[in-house]
């Protein structure tokens, strides 16, 4: 089981999404639990590596336009939650 670490920007993203009431935050928690346990995500979540400045990060879809960007640090056994939000919010 991985240890979860959250970056400051992720915390702000979650707070903003929670406050808006537009997203079912239990979906995010479910994805995080699966990743924490080291389980593979279903193809519906389209997990994939990112490129360029994000090349050491992964992205998955919680909903069609709701993403989670994360990193797995195998040396420290950590799941690092980096960002969450829409394509337009994350990749400006």
Question: Can you annotate each of these PLM segments?
Answer:
Residues 70:
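Short, charged interaction patches at domain edges and termini
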């Amino acid at each position: 089981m991985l240890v979860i670490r959250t970056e400051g920007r992720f915390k702000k993203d979650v707070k903003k999404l929670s406050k808006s009431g537009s997203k079912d935050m239990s979906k995010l928690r479910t994805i995080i639990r699966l990743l924490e346990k080291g389980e593979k995500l279903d193809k519906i979540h389209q997990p994939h590596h990112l490129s360029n400045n994000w090349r050491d990060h992964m992205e998955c879809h919680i909903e069609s336009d709701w993403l989670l960007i994360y990193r797995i640090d195998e040396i420290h056994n950590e799941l690092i939650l980096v960002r969450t939000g829409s394509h337009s919010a994350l990749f400006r």
